[in-house]
Regions:
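A short helix-loop-beta-strand connector motif used in the catalytic cores of GNAT acetyltransferases and
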Residues: 44-56
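A conserved beta-turn-beta hairpin within the catalytic core of GNAT-like acetyltransferases
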Residues: 71-80, 89, 110, 141-145
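Conserved beta-strand-loop-alpha-helix junction that forms the acyl-donor binding cleft
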Residues: 115-125, 141-144
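Conserved GNAT-fold acetyl-CoA-binding loop/helix
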Residues: 3, 17-46
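Conserved N-terminal entry element of GNAT/NAT acetyltransferase domains
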Residues: 1-10, 155
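Conserved GNAT acetyl-CoA-binding A-motif
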Residues: 105-117
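Conserved acetyl-CoA-binding loop-helix of GNAT-fold acetyltransferases
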Residues: 84, 90-103, 130
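Conserved beta-strand in the GNAT
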Residues: 56, 62-70, 78, 83
Length: 155
């Protein structure tokens, strides 16, 4: 059974491990050499736990996924550092995390969730499309083509 909760400081090390694992796959899929997520340490995760909404997915007592949410303005949040451990992928954990976030954000009266992903990471774009996201913008601001995906929450 999967359980989702807000991250605690003691979770930081495992969150770094999952983020690194997920973003090593991301750079391969994106055809890029590097991403800031691969250079993040426990200190940054602890800072995010303090200043953002960070959630973890657990199977039994093991953290197997994580995601971060940052408020952009009154109506919009930014989803980042979303990842599920390799061992636990394709089991529906990512879907559960997104569904959970949708419910929490609707309770908070958030209207839009946005995120960025590489245009070449078609499996991620498909995943997000299947969760109700759509392409809102395209940019090359990081040196490769990224799409901004957006989800409008319905009340």
């Amino acid at each position: 059974m999967v359980r989702i909760r807000k991250a605690e400081p003691a979770d930081a090390k495992r969150i770094v491990e999952i983020t690194t694992e997920a973003f090593l796959q991301y750079v391969k899929a994106a055809g890029i050499k590097d991403t800031p997520a691969l250079h993040e340490g426990e200190e940054q995760v602890l800072e995010d736990i303090k200043n953002k909404d960070v959630y973890v997915a657990l199977v039994e007592d093991e953290i197997v996924g994580s995601v971060r949410i940052q408020k952009m303005d009154e109506d919009t949040v930014y989803l980042s550092r979303f990842g599920v451990s390799m061992e636990h992928r394709n089991l529906g954990i990512g879907k559960l995390l997104v569904n959970y976030l949708d419910a929490v954000m609707m309770q908070k009266k958030v209207k839009h969730i946005i995120l960025h992903t590489a245009s070449k990471a078609s499996h991620l774009i498909k995943f997000y499309y299947n969760r109700g996201f759509y392409v809102d913008d395209v940019s090359k601001d990081k040196g490769y083509i990224r799409v901004q995906l957006r989800k409008d929450l319905m009340y």
